[in-house]
Every structure is written in C-alpha cells, then in structure tokens.
Amino acid sequence: MERYRLSQIDHLRQDGICFDANIWLYLFCPLGNYRIHTVIAYSKCYARILEVKLPVYVDIVIVSEVINRYLRLAHSYYCKNQGIHMDYKKYRKTEDYQKILREVYSLVKKRILPHCIIGNISYDKDMFISLLDDSDYDKDFNDHHITNLCLRHNLCLMTHDSDFKHTNIPI
C-alpha cells in the first residue's frame, strides 16, 4: 500500500484525506506540548491541503477522540498545575473543565468542521461483526473503524500513529 511523506501531498491519488485524531491535536491543541518541528510540519501540510482544496474527511469517531484526548490533556495539566491528584470524573465538575469543554467544542465547530466533509459509514450487523472478528488485534476498535472509513471513501489517512503501519490503506 502507498505510503506518502508530507511533502508529497500534491501527489495523492485518493479522493481525499482523513486526519486521524492525533493530527488534529497537533494542529489545534496547545496542551499537548508537542515537538515544535512536528507541529510546524503538519501545519504547513494542512495549509497546503486547504490551498489545493483537497477534500478532508472527518467523522464522529475521530471528533470524539479529539474531544476526549483534549479534555484528558487538560485534566492532566490542571492536576499538575494545582499540585493535586484528582479523578477525571471529579475534574469534570470543575470550572476549568467547563471552560475547556466550551473551548474544544468551539474548536471543532469553527476550525475543524468548516473545512471537512463528514464521512459516514452505516454499519449493518454483518459489517459490525466483521469489525469485532478482525484478526488484526494490534489496532483498537476505533482504528478498525477509521480504516473502514478510508476504504469506503477512497481516502489517504494522515496519522502519526504506528498502529496503522500494516493497514491496507494509503497513509
């Protein structure tokens, strides 16, 4: 299967691109404390994707992963700054959580969704069972779904997750 570098974005032969949650976090989550060269590389690539109008797909599973990871990072950051240990469920009752939740929802509504096509998959029972029966146990359940999304819509997956390295989709 094809493997592309960020610099090859103009050479994709697929109908569009799907960003894994980690890419959205590199682009828009300052709490991640990511390596600056990685953030810059993905930011330049994203700007080029928008410039050439390459369709970018997202779905509810990816958005859910972005939201949940962003909130978990905020929880960790909050506890570290407060010098405390706090259960995540207790954190959800804090003003900080409410502020971050509004922030991440706004991010999705204003910075992600306006530039994306929603790529849905309707699973029938047999398709759902095939997700559960897949013999590739190195990937988590959501990764199986994202692979199917890319296959269904002929998408290249942009990810920084090595779990996808042996998939049958272009990356």
Identify the residue ranges that each predicted region occupies.
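Short, well-structured N-terminal submotif of metal-dependent ribonuclease cores
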Residues: M1-I62, N68-M86, H153
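Helix-loop junctions and short alpha-helical segments
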Residues: Y70, A74-S76, I84-R111
